[in-house]
Regions:
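Short, well-structured alpha-helical segments in soluble
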Residues: 140-152
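Charged helix-capping and loop-helix junction motifs
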Residues: 169-172
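Generic hydrophobic/aromatic pocket-lining and core-packing "Φ" positions
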Residues: 145, 175, 197-198
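Hydrophobic beta-strand scaffold residues
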Residues: 182-186
């Protein structure tokens, strides 16, 4: 996640839109157990009352040294290399009224679906250098899911494709346990039509 994005600021200006130095507009959440783990390009102070947690998982890969040996461009932190985690987090829970930048600037201001939601990032995938894709190990994905539940999240947004072959893989089982703990799981189902079939809804 890119914590400097106004989508994740906990402050608002006089117009009610997110700013870096306005009035604090979020309060602490009772019962929250998450942490803000510092690392490369990410300090503990990058978290706030909107971005309330940031952790990264790579033990199944062999730890940070193993990831760095294979993907030296990556950030050994919750910082996003290819932008996917930032995009999906801001789409789900980014602040209201944030001025879009880059090619999206034509849209003016943007908002997440649940703009008052808090965000906790659990990074378990590591990007290719061209930022076209990312990969990781199932053990790290499961560790991230389980940690999110233990930390006290209400919703897990899992925007990492899907499976057509194995509905009982370890990540799916972790989602069942998350649901049993009262956590709503929103998981993508992939971006390709199954056997060239598509729905015409």
């Amino acid at each position: 996640i890119w914590p400097e994005s106004l989508s994740f600021s906990d402050r608002t200006g006089a117009n009610g839109n997110a700013t870096k130095d306005g009035k604090l507009s979020y309060v602490r959440i009772p019962g929250w157990h998450g942490r803000c783990v510092p690392g490369e390009g990410f300090t503990a102070t990058d978290c706030n009352q909107k971005l309330i947690g940031a952790q990264f998982f790579n033990a199944s890969w062999g730890g940070s040294a193993a990831v760095e040996a294979e993907r030296p461009w990556e950030f050994m932190s919750a910082r996003d290399y290819n932008g996917h985690g930032t995009h999906t987090s801001s789409t789900a829970g980014g602040n209201h009224g944030v001025v879009a930048t880059g090619p999206a600037a034509v849209f003016g201001s943007i908002s997440g679906m649940a703009p008052r939601a808090r965000i906790a990032m659990y990074k378990a995938l590591w990007s290719t250098e061209d930022a076209s894709t990312a990969s990781g190990f199932t053990g790290d994905l499961v560790a991230a899911i389980d940690q999110a539940v233990a930390d006290g999240v209400d919703v897990i947004n899992y925007s990492i494709s899907g499976t057509l072959t194995n509905f009982a893989d370890p990540a799916e089982i972790s989602f069942l346990f998350a649901a049993a703990a009262g956590v709503f799981v929103s998981a993508s189902a992939g971006k390709s039509a199954w056997r060239n079939l598509s729905s015409r809804l």
